[in-house]
Amino acid sequence: MVMLVMATVGFAVNFWAWALISPLGPLFRENGKLGALSESDVALMVAVPVVVGSLGRIPVGALTDKYGGRVMFPMVSLATVVPVLALGLFAQSSYLLILVFGFFLGLAGTAFAVGVPFVNAWFPPERRGLAVGVFGAGMGGTAVSALTTVRLYNGLGSAVPFLITAGILVVYAVAAWVMLRDAPGRSAPAGSFVSRLAANARLPITWQACVLYAVAFGGYVAFSVYLPAYLRTAYDLTPADAANRMAGFVLVAVVLRPIGGWLSDRFGPVPVLAAGYLVVVVGAAVAASTPLLEWLGTVAFLAMAAALGSGSGATFALVAKVTEPARVGGVTGLVGAAGGLGGFVPPLIMGYVYGRTESYAIGLGLLSVTAALTLVLTLTTVRSTLRAAANDLTQSRRTTHHHEERM
């Protein structure tokens, strides 16, 4: 339990750092500190850390398989301190500098690929869905950023939110080095990074989970980084009000993620995923009409938050059930990268479409269609993969039992 708590805290702290720029995007546009910024400029600013953190999960996941979470958690946390301090102390004077150090801030997003294999190894298969879901609730670090960054920026100074986050990252890195232990019996995989990456990429579950997570977690990331700008533009909210509502969205998704993992342990991942994508199909279609925020709009967005959170938890419950333990880190890196990239593209599309149509309807309509296609994939191909894995496990147990009887 201590290992799960420490991993979850590390994930949350790094995600807090990863999301520092997002709440400030609309504020920079409003106060003119960086000059005249377009909707696309803000979208790019908040999306750069997302794509770097996503692609970085591929090598970091493979390195975690090799060196373990006890080494990688402190390493990622300490490395993240550098861009956080740079953004707080001098980079806010230039849009270009924010993009450059936002690029390196993306390193914080790779903590996810450290935690999943680390936590997975500490729990038996029948409890991994819940355990990885609890760890995944660390994505609530983005809510901490949403609730505190603008307040600290306006109240205490532009550097303060970054200095506080950097200090917490250092404290966590030291605590992780002292307290974390890799699961007993952990063995480093054989072969080069390239050969292991290729082998993991060829697994059917890898590309299937990549699609599932690109929509579920990608949708969550897209909303968590772009929702403040969307609410500011579509509903004319203040930056603080928009950030608070985004925090509510994040909180619902965070709470539902471990519940999605637990439900997957009880009923299987496919029903949980299918229900989640169906909710997104309907919710995005409703939101596309820009309904009144105080009732229908709020219900639509919170329902999607619940669906995306539970779907994210269910995806890694699926990975844990189908993937052999020695490959979980590598597969997690690829799937996590897909999820992050799924969060990178929608803000750019939304900003581009709004800049030309002054409407978000097309972007949200595309989300609804994408979720519908993913629902079909879940009920067909993914269901078959899970059934085949269950049959293989049953056959393996029968073979082992027969061998033991002969001995």
Language-model segments: residues:
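C-terminal ends and interior cores of transmembrane alpha-helices
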Residues: 78-92, 278-292
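Hydrophobic core of transmembrane alpha-helices in multi-pass small-molecule transporters
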Residues: 96-110, 296-310
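Helix-loop-helix hairpin linking two adjacent transmembrane segments in secondary transporters
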Residues: 134-180
